[in-house]
From Swiss-Prot:
The gene is tsf. Gene3D superfamilies: 1.10.286.20, DNA helicase RuvA subunit, C-terminal domain, Elongation factor Ts, dimerisation domain. This is Elongation factor Ts. It comes from the Bacteria. InterPro entries: EF-Ts_dimer_sf, Transl_elong_EFTs/EF1B, Transl_elong_EFTs/EF1B_dimer, Transl_elong_Ts_CS, UBA-like_sf. One of its GO terms (cellular component) is cytoplasm. It comes from Helicobacter acinonychis (strain Sheeba).
Amino acid sequence: MSEISAQLVKKLRDLTDVGMMDCKKALVEVAGDLQKAIDFLREKGLSKAAKKADRIASEGVVALEVAPDFKSAVMVEINSETDFVAKNEGFKELVKKTLETIKVHNAHTREELLKSSLDNKPFEEYLHSQIAVIGENILVRKIANSKAPSSHIINGYAHSNARVGVLITMKYNNEKNAPKAVELARNIAMHAAAMKPQVLDCKDFSLDFVKKETLVLIAEIEKDNEEAKRLGKPLKNIPTFGSRIELSDEVLAHQKKVFEDELKEQGKPEKIWDKIVLGKMERFIADNTLIDQRLTLLGQFYVMDDKKTIAQVIADYSKELNDTLEITEYVRFELGEGIEKKAENFAEEVALQMK
């Protein structure tokens, strides 16, 4: 076999982005055949990537791209092991190519993305090659691919720290109001990025979830009331319910009668009941929908006007525009949400803090 030239090693390095020594070893292994050396390194890279895939990837980025006409958008969460790698130019290029691949192949799931192609090879193979080159486990964890039907727009917001992204799809009736819908969707996406609503509406909750969360909520309020009582401050009302989905017509009718009976017993004139009962019912609903106010986008109070819920803000816009605006889809990604670090990593962090 002829000696492996420096030019050939450099060419292989340029083609594969693998270190010079590994390139030379690969060329020696395959007797200087460039294509076989590329295949050899790919196989070697895949082997390394498989080992790296056992590591926990909880850093990375959330990135999104909204089409200029606001009729489509894609969003992705890509995890790496360290924040340092997430700032690497190679990693940024991977994120860019991932978003483009989702658009080109119209992928709607992670599985569809991995089976699609990029640069004439499977995307999954491309991802493994990047794991080998970058040197960390990299995971495409979530993707979103939204298309706006007629009379809908999509807008979004990605936080500057690249850790949170939100997409909002909004419906309108009059095409002239599309720009206003775009503006409102952007503002609501910014709200959602900050306030972390879990779902769009209380209808997305299961009854079991609401009942469990209500018990937790009551325990919190009772604890707060103990402290308030000690300090001589007003006590909070203890709710019976947690969400609007529990407030059936029967429940509301019963509560209204309770208030009317109280007014009758107090000797209040019947002609003023309606106004008093209306206020009491509004307070009852507010006190018994606290889970909605915490966890639903429509039920949360707007960060730019904390006197109004998001639902009320949308209603006000609709009235102003003489239209009916409605959020039809809400997607929020937060980097590493639900990923737990290994116990030993946490123990090491605690130990370091105690030194």
